Amino acid sequence: MNLEEYGRMYEAEETQWWYAGMRAISLSLLAAEWPDGAADDRRILDAGCGTGNNLSHFRRFGRTVGVDLSDEALRFCRSRGVAATRGSLLSLPFPDASFEAVTSFDVHYHRWVEDDRVAVREIVRVMKPGGLFLVRVPALKMLWGAHDEAVHSRHRYTRGEVRRLLEDEGLEVARLTYANTLLFPVIATRRTLDRLLHRHGSDVGFLPPPLEWTFRHLLGIEARLVRHLALPVGASVFAVARKPRGGATAARG
């Protein structure tokens, strides 16, 4: 990711419609798995934690720690007062079976994650048997645009690709859904225009307040929907998976 993107993220993550909406969906999915809220003995790793905003919010469910390869991201984590350490998803700096849960948001698609299977395998390694994995990745090649270039994307996924990626590393998929469904026509149109007009740069930024409110509200509706059904199309894919209590099976192939 371009270094300037971390500053934009830090300024936008708490209130900007996309970040706030994606966080609402993540919190909804976690609350569905942990309806009783926090547990003192629950350790949660955010793999590829960026500037650490999610770590602050996930404290309601347990003790959080982040890992990120970027020193710039870790600097922002320190300014938030959240625990984070330097490391790669391809070689996580934690012992086996360290965490009851791992989250990872828009990380596996990065160009520096050379093999997403190895990254998932590392996450499975540090999860305890019965542990939970919540992952989000960008969806659908048709939505590729200037933002993907700005954040060094390698791939956009289908729901089926995410299922295969997780199951091939021995995880049991409990929930699998697209998200950013209600705004999909808007996003698809914007990305098409970006390509036609050769626009460059990231999508991170604030819209006029009425649009910010509307878009956040629509994603808030999706946050409630995804607890009960799988949305059929969208700009992101969310999955909730568990490591079998007997331990994940060996990867196939």
Each language-model region and where it sits:
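Short N-terminal helix/helix-N-cap motif within the alpha/beta-hydrolase-1
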Residues: 56, 112-116, 145
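Short conserved AdoMet
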Residues: 59-60, 78, 128, 167, ...
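Conserved S-adenosyl-L-methionine
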Residues: 171-181
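A C-terminal cap/extension of S-adenosyl-L-methionine-dependent methyltransferases
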Residues: 183-252
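Short catalytic micro-motifs in class I SAM-dependent methyltransferases
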Residues: 106-110
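Short, glycine-/aromatic-enriched active-site segment of Class I SAM-dependent methyltransferases
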Residues: 133-155, 161-167
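A short glycine-rich, Lys/Arg-flanked "PGG" loop and its adjoining helix->strand segment in the class I
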Residues: 117-132
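Conserved N-terminal segment of class I S-adenosyl-L-methionine
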Residues: 1-97, 101-105, 120, 234-237, ...
